[in-house]
């Protein structure tokens, strides 16, 4: 009987020690988060067989709640036990959760430390600093203002360059007119009604000088025709007489012409 009682006492002591050790390892925290535009607002890595929180996204659901901390290990999300989950499996689980859903999150606190390489690259994670309030909008506004100011300056320069090419009238005070073609505007000339007198007199605008003694005649085209006819046809006498007759008629017409003529 005494031996049995001793064994029971030893077993009780051992069982008590195991419970205390498990209690120290399984210090848990739980909270409820509402899925928002940024999800749960957590940056999670796979640390061995566990999913561990490394960073909280600013203005995210977890950061606003304030109960979860970097280093916590996920136990369950909603009704799903995620111990042993990979990141891919956890992502597939979150894909079926819609915005506005309230999830109960349970984690281990002070269970394992975050790897040093993840602590060193905190500044390199853009999600940990997202979203920064009003700075992106201010930057966009500043960019827009710079673009608009540069555009305005360009427009002013263009206005200065083009002001000499604008029409002198405005459409508000003058009726619509058909635009003038550049070739006509630049190369066209205006005809003016002006009478020019041509003749041998000194009073004429254009005076013709002739030497009555030696009258130079231009070579008659009929001589060429006569030569061609002589080479090609046998009736050379008739063609020659016709050519001389035509040339005589031309000389008679020149004698009848007036010495002064006017052109409008």
UniProtKB/Swiss-Prot annotation:
InterPro entries: PDZ, PDZ_sf, PDZD9
Residue ranges of domain PDZ in the record: 22-109
UniProt cross-references to Pfam families, sorted A to Z: PDZ
Disulfide bond residue pairs: none
SUPFAM superfamilies: PDZ domain-like (SSF50156)
Stated name of the protein: PDZ domain-containing protein 9
Organism this protein belongs to: Macaca fascicularis
């Amino acid at each position: 009987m005494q031996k049995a009682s001793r064994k029971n006492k030893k077993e009780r002591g051992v069982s008590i020690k195991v419970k205390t050790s498990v209690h120290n390892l399984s210090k848990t925290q739980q909270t409820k988060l509402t899925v928002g535009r940024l999800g749960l607002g957590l940056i999670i890595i796979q640390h061995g067989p566990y999913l561990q929180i490394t960073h909280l996204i600013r203005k995210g659901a977890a950061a606003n709640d304030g109960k979860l901390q970097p280093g916590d290990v996920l136990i369950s999300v909603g009704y799903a036990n995620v111990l042993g989950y990979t990141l891919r499996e956890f992502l597939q689980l979150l894909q079926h959760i819609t915005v506005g859903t309230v999830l109960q999150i349970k984690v281990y606190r002070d269970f394992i430390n975050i790897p040093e390489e993840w602590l060193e690259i905190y500044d390199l994670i853009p999600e940990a600093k997202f979203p920064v309030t009003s700075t992106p909008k201010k930057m966009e506004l500043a960019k827009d203002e710079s673009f608009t100011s540069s555009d305005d300056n360009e427009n002013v320069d263009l206005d200065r360059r083009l002001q000499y090419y604008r029409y002198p009238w405005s459409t508000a005070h003058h009726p619509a007119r058909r635009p003038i073609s550049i070739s006509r505007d630049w190369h066209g000339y205006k005809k003016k009604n002006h009478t020019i007198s041509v003749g041998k007199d000194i009073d004429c605008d254009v005076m013709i000088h002739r030497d009555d003694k030696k009258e130079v005649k231009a070579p008659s085209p009929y001589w060429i025709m006569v030569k061609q006819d002589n080479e090609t046809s046998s009736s050379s006498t008739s063609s020659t007489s016709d050519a001389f007759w035509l040339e005589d008629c031309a000389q008679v017409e020149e004698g009848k012409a007036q010495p002064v003529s006017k052109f409008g």
